């Protein structure tokens, strides 16, 4: 850290004299960021590093703004980045969509860094909340609405449609149901849903790329209503797909459903990964290890942590009133991942395809209730494509 003129330490609760400044902030041109010691700097790192991400994102937006011609698409916005597969981003992104003021917003919606202070307050805890009857009813309502929004997205999936157009439909469907699209501005995520095509594992940002015949695409929906979040996703075929894609998507769905069949009071959360990996490996596929299922209710992400791979160290035992997601990400090749320079798009390191399915579940006295199930069919959409 570089020495600078005397200032007051920016760590919350510390008013000591500060002569050190974050070197990364200096490089990025961020003003301020003064600390009294390495210890204070390290103690503030979890929130401070978000300033770096925001500055990098704003720099990227400034670069994007230089593309002024209508229809001018940049498929290589990050000079020097080596893509792992054939997929490319299609920039610029459209502007952030507004949410009417009458719709209730989560605490991160208007935070400059998109940070959820309520989640940060419980970060690191392994205590799993048991929902009250009132909470459970709130979750039933919001999960039903999330399902309706995903069903709207499902009708959009076809060759020639851009993932940006799917995101637009999702955004409008949320507003029509008096819901806030939970991904929007969550740690500055720029869109209202995630769309993950082919080698994208998760957290793909909707953009101007048209879906192509033979693609697979996952659409991940979370909505917020009356203080609760509901979360689900499905993977879809785009037109006719090859047999490898069919096997991958079918196996991924089976991994989810076999894990759901095991959910009941007394089961350890770590057991779900054993079930998922056994079925994936039996079919020649691998299980992503970097991203997990999670508790969800008034918080978007909270305890329990639900890994999908075998021999994990997840903490906790299922009890009636627990609500959480299972969302296995299954890959054709290796499970290793990397992230695009946008800070969100997770892709397979070998460029091979990945699929995912997700439900939000309530542990009952005898088993579980799939809160995000389809009401008009027991089959996921891909089985009817």
UniProtKB/Swiss-Prot annotation:
Zn(2+) 1 binds at residues 9, 14, 36, 40. Gene3D superfamilies: Creatinase/methionine aminopeptidase superfamily (3.90.230.10). It is found in: Cytoplasm. Keywords: Aminopeptidase, Cytoplasm, Hydrolase, Metal-binding, Protease, Zinc, Zinc-finger. Its main location: cytoplasm. It catalyses: Release of N-terminal amino acids, preferentially methionine, from peptides and arylamides. Its EC number is 3.4.11.18. A zinc finger (C6H2-type) spans 6-59. NCBIfam families: met_pdase_I. This is Methionine aminopeptidase 1. It comes from Gallus gallus. The lineage of its organism: Eukaryota, Metazoa, Chordata, Craniata, Vertebrata.
